[in-house]
Amino acid sequence: MKIAVACGGTGGHIFPGLATADILRQRGHDITLWLAGKDVETPAVKDWAGPVVTVQAEGLPSGFSLRAVRAAWRLLRAARACRRIMRPNRPDVLLAMGSYASVGPVCAALSLGIPVVLHEANVLPGRTISLFSRWATAVAGSFEETRFYLRRKDIVVTGMPIRKELEKAARTIPPHETGRDIFTLLVMGGSRGAHRLNDLVSAAVIQIHKGGHRIRVIHLTGVADEATIRKAYQDAGVNAVVSAFEQDMAPIYAAADIAICRSGASTCAELLDFAVPALQVPYPEATKDHQMVNARAMEKAGAVDVVPERDLSLPWLTDYIVGCMQTPGRLARMSAASRSRAMQSAAESLASLVIQVGNGEYGRTV
């Protein structure tokens, strides 16, 4: 079967798309990736050996403006280019991971009568999924709660595909044991970094260390704050590992007693798969506050605590971390809640749905 996978734009679309594409290729299908020509795509697909189609695309700003008109025109031009490329090389089915990068391939597929499978990573559907869900053959999602935000309710909950090396590690690494000799805090600001979060957490950790508590921190700061945060920990004598980013996250998740982090879809999926308790501080500038919606779903499941960034303060954060250090049983319950909600075969589940649609079997009853 020939399958097109539109997963360009951001890491949050590329990596789950690649994870699913790998499974589909392992099952013997011919896979073509459709990307949007963004810088983040190049390193992500460097090990991809299959064909790639790149059609330049960009996001559509909210509201009416000259910039929005230009962006809409470019999206229309991209859709025409996609149709021109797709027509002589018709796939049997298109999997689109959302974002503006999927608009062109989805428009092309629908106009050519090619079945479309959409995947929504977040609880709150983005504009692309909301727009095209009524015409797609199937819509998959990471969260059960997504069905409350779409007109169609037949959402297939597959979970969020994560990078294949992480998924393999999540299945093989033993569950984390709380209550060990030294409490390990993982701090992640997300792909954009998080200056205020970095400052507050580092100050809280230093204060806790000076108070005589044994604490270790693994702090992924983003590029801008790496040197400053590393020096702050060094000057205070804190047991700290500081890096801008980290590719090999499996041993880091395995070591963490709790994470303080954002609540993007990939982060949520990885926390669940590795059963890491977390304090989630949603990125306040996220479109339609979708990270807060993700975090509240995680909180409802008992897997995380949530605090808006505007409510963070040094005294509150210090008390929270110390409280976690003193109540390992509570962290163990959060970890168990994560484990019960995790969907560690998300890429396999999504791949199976795509194959079912491509074979014309989706929705068929025997």
Question: What is the meaning of each model-derived region?
Answer:
Residues 30, 51, 110-171:
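Active-site-proximal region of nucleotide-activated glycan assembly enzymes
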Residues 91-93, 254-269, 276-277:
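Acidic donor-binding loop of glycosyltransferase active sites
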Residues 39-43, 91-112:
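An aromatic- and histidine-rich active-site surface loop
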Residues 39-48, 171-259, 292-296, 300, ...:
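Donor-nucleotide binding loops and adjacent catalytic segments primarily
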Residues 3-8, 25-74, 223, 310:
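Conserved nucleotide-sugar phosphate-binding/catalytic loop shared by glycosyltransferases and other
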Residues 343-366:
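C-terminal alpha-helical cap of glycosyltransferases
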Residues 330-344:
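A short, well-ordered alpha-helix in the C-terminal region of glycosyltransferases
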Residues 64-93:
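An amphipathic, basic-hydrophobic alpha-helix
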